[in-house]
Amino acid sequence: MTSQEYEPIQWSDESQTNNDSVNDAYADVNTTHESRRRTTLQPNSTSQSMIGTLRKYARFIGPGLMVSVSYMDPGNYSTAVAAGSAHRYKLLFSVLVSNFMAAFWQYLCARLGAVTGLDLAQNCKKHLPFGLNITLYILAEMAIIATDLAEVVGTAISLNILFHIPLALGVILTVVDVLIVLLAYKPNGSMKGIRIFEAFVSLLVVLTVVCFTVELFYAKLGPAKEIFSGFLPSKAVFEGDGLYLSLAILGATVMPHSLYLGSGVVQPRLREYDIKNGHYLPDANDMDNNHDNYRPSYEAISETLHFTITELLISLFTVALFVNCAILIVSGATLYGSTQNAEEADLFSIYNLLCSTLSKGAGTVFVLALLFSGQSAGIVCTLSGQMVSEGFLNWTVSPALRRSATRAVAITPCLILVLVAGRSGLSGALNASQVVLSLLLPFVSAPLLYFTSSKKIMRVQLNRTKELSRTTDKKPVADRTEDDETIELEEMGIGSSSQERSLVSPAPEYKDMSNGMIVTVLAIIVWLIISGLNFYMLLGFTTGKEVHL
């Protein structure tokens, strides 16, 4: 008997009936003490559940931050600065709408990568005809090169301003730096290595955010009402050069390469879950850890997809949206109404204007933000280029050589422009890259819409056995057909006929995870809007419309 319990009194038979209530009272006392003891020892279930959810969410932090880097590269600087200097805060609405569209496309990318286990490029190779696949590969490489131009330009300019490094040498330094980091990134390696790499990129993102937070304190922003009213639609968005600048913001925000990146960074955590829970058995003979035959289980998708999408959306609507809005707000506060020709200013001139209108520190912080964002964007752009070349084509050369070649092809035009035209060449390359990306976006995004709406592609087998998770065919999933899977079943001894196979294992059951009707219609509308607006902007350029980007 514990110190908190009371022994019931033993009554005589003749008095038992009259005193049952006394024993009941003692029993109530014991029950009360036991309840208090359990309440003291056990933590609150609600708080414990919240802590567990936060810990689980923390394991998924990383991919969303890497994707958000794609939406705050030097191309965004150029368009946001032009918009802020010309219309002050009125085009914040365009930044907000562009961010919503980008988030919607990334939602589709995450679903495609999780359900199929393949990125967008690999799905193109597996499901599209050869000719169309090659055409899309060429367009994707053009998008990678155009994006890389902007990243290299931003980094080279920031190195030139901060450390007086010649532009040509700055371009070369960006190549060396990105290659070193890229060679250290192994998407099929251990999760520890992947998380270290993601932490490095996240650090650059955080530094960029810190720089613009400081920049906002430097700037004289004016009434808060004026800033927040910029997030509402106004005539400035749809009239004159405001419409063109809004389209430029859209083209600089919804980047083609981010679609390949967003669909290719979700697999490691799915694979980690399947390995831990016995749904996937890696081939011990695969020394390169390629995991080419991996297909996520339904359990892994159900467990991780929600956290993946949540982390992605939080990153886009906090980090990416904040940085893009901060660029426009700072430029609007300092350059709008300036006697200097801010609309025609390049990044060099923007630095000089910030130094003269605010302070030397404000200009330096702006260039530091440009350096951090240029470096991080260059890294993720090169990763996207790797996914494109490996997904569309089955290169047999070593990964290091393949990545080096991809990066070299991307920076060659930029290096030539620097050597031939110098500073003006860099500015021209930055502006031209945004036009090219606007033209390529509809073609690159169309397959994403098709794949995520296909019931045949977006399905997951529910009754997959763990033994079948390890495939005997060395052919990658992107190259495998239904005939290959049938042959594999026969080689594993699971019947050479449909009757024999039905006796060994039940018929496969699939879960449809394709887009619903509402999402499909919304995706088509968004695609048509982006395509139409981009075409309108390009039409303006061809007819001689002056738009300073």
Swiss-Prot record:
Species of the source: Saccharomyces cerevisiae (strain ATCC 204508 / S288c)
Keywords: Cell membrane, Manganese, Membrane, Metal-binding, Transmembrane, Transmembrane helix, Transport, Vacuole
Subcellular location(s) of the protein: Vacuole lumen; Vesicle; Cell membrane
Predominant place of localization: other
Annotated segments matching region Disordered: 1-23
Protein name: Manganese transporter SMF2
Taxonomic lineage of the native organism: Eukaryota, Fungi, Dikarya, Ascomycota, Saccharomycotina
Record flagged with keyword Transcription: no
Record-linked InterPro entries: NRAMP_fam
Disulphide bond pairs: none
Membrane topology: Multi-pass membrane protein
Gene field: SMF2
